[in-house]
């Protein structure tokens, strides 16, 4: 399967066979080919596709970890349960609600996803350590900011970005400090453009049920959870989280029924729809009117 021109030119990766070969070589170099892997599984297209690719390579995935909180979409858990059954991998469900409330105290809306990701990464490292596993797999693709950190690490080690070593690195390095063996993060999709991830998803017959939110990457329909729709300068707290869930649950249910995507920013109550059509905004406004009046 050939990859997009962007992936070929910007990440020096031509096709799936090349990616598979590069990944196996990286595992061999780290003497990790037979080691166990723990996967941070969100239930979305990226982590699901990454799991399918890793299984295709014959890598040893021992556990899926699904992090959730009180305001998570039910559909995410459902998708992870399906993946667990499809690939016969046990899943650990881990509730981060209390930790999220603690770490977001006094923080602004713009930092919610960063805080949540850090909590999940910290806990994934802890769980992996308990299981005697040092490789953590994520569904990070070329869209992610961590791509830059991985490239910087490769520059430090090799003097340049060696693209065919991007998938298996000890980035972030803070988790390996003082350890006998470095903690490795395996990102099989880290060089792929979104369109290539979608191609791979089709190739592996991965079907994802959507919540029908707008998502954090306009144009790519990548979903997460309703808390990302807190206004940038809003003070994060439990009351706001409850409101975000209530409003966005209604909005996504309407959007799913009518075949579009919708999300509500709070406390501004800004309505976002994809595609942008007045009729869709009207549908959401009408659905939310009862909430505002109750």
From Swiss-Prot:
> Gene3D superfamilies from the entry?
HUPs
Q: What is the lineage of its organism?
A: Archaea, Methanobacteriati, Methanobacteriota, Methanomada group, Methanococci
Query: What is the recorded name of this protein?
Result: Uncharacterized protein MJ1016
Organism for this UniProt entry? Methanocaldococcus jannaschii (strain ATCC 43067 / DSM 2661 / JAL-1 / JCM 10045 / NBRC 100440)
> Which SUPFAM superfamilies does its entry note?
Adenine nucleotide alpha hydrolases-like (SSF52402)
């Amino acid at each position: 399967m050939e990859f997009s021109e962007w992936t070929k030119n910007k990440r020096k990766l031509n096709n799936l066979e090349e990616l598979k070969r590069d990944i196996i070589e990286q595992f061999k170099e780290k003497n990790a080919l037979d080691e166990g892997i723990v996967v941070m599984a969100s239930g979305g297209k990226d982590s699901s596709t990454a799991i399918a690719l890793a299984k295709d390579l014959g890598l040893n995935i021992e556990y899926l970890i699904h992090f959730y909180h009180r305001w998570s979409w039910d559909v995410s858990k459902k998708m992870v349960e399906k993946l667990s059954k499809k690939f016969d991998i046990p899943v650990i469900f881990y509730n981060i609600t209390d930790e999220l409330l603690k770490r977001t105290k006094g923080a602004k809306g713009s930092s919610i996803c960063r805080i949540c990701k850090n909590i999940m990464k910290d806990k994934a490292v802890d769980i992996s350590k308990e299981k005697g596993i040092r490789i953590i797999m994520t569904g990070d693709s070329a869209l992610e900011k961590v791509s830059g950190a991985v490239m910087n690490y490769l520059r430090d080690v090799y003097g340049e970005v060696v693209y065919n070593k991007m998938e298996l690195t000890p980035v972030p390095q803070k988790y390996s400090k003082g350890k006998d063996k470095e903690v490795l993060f395996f990102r099989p999709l880290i060089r792929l453009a979104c369109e290539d991830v979608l191609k791979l998803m089709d190739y592996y017959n991965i079907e994802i049920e959507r919540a029908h939110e707008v998502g954090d990457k306009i144009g790519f329909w990548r979903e997460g959870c309703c808390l990302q729709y807190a206004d940038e300068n809003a003070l994060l707290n439990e009351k706001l989280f409850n409101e975000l869930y209530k409003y966005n649950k209604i909005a996504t249910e309407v959007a799913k029924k009518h075949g579009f995507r919708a999300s509500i920013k709070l406390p501004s109550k800004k309505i976002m729809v994809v595609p942008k059509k007045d009729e869709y905004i009207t549908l959401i406004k009408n659905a939310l009117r009862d909430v505002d009046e109750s």
